[in-house]
Amino acid sequence: MKKQGIFNSQISYFVASMGHKDMLSIVDMGYPIPKDATFVDLVFDKGIPNFIDTIKMVLYELEVEKVIIAGEMEVNNLKNYQKVIDIFSNIEIEKKSHEEFKDIAKNSKFFIRTGECTPFSNIILVSGVIF
């Protein structure tokens, strides 16, 4: 049995499969995941699991060199925006319009849907390298 880290087998597989510059999107309940995308749906109920906790768990195992968010998060969801800024204080944070974000996210290797129910709680994690 695995001792630590991500116990969800699909997410563990997603992280282990990431190469340099691959993208993994963590999104809220209402996000329109592309029809043919590979994703895991973690939603149990509204808010469970939440956006920030999901990011923190993925970061436990994934090396990230850059993140992309919708600029609208700063105005419409200041609480999560500030948490994202704190979590990624040493990593490039690229802001795009929500429409641009959705276009970029279509290229994500994987999606993780959370139970988050606050506006613009979506992020693209761009995989880095550990050397």
Curated annotation (Swiss-Prot):
Keywords: Carbohydrate metabolism, Cytoplasm, Isomerase
CC terms in the record's Gene Ontology section: cytosol
Binding of substrate, residues: D28, H98, F120, S121, N122
Pathway: Carbohydrate metabolism; D-ribose degradation; D-ribose 5-phosphate from beta-D-ribopyranose: step 1/2
Annotated family: Belongs to the RbsD / FucU family. RbsD subfamily.
Source organism per UniProt: Petrotoga mobilis (strain DSM 10674 / SJ95)
UniProt key word rRNA-binding: no
Name of the protein in question: D-ribose pyranase
Enzyme Commission code: 5.4.99.62
Active-site residues per Swiss-Prot or TrEMBL entry: H20 (proton donor)
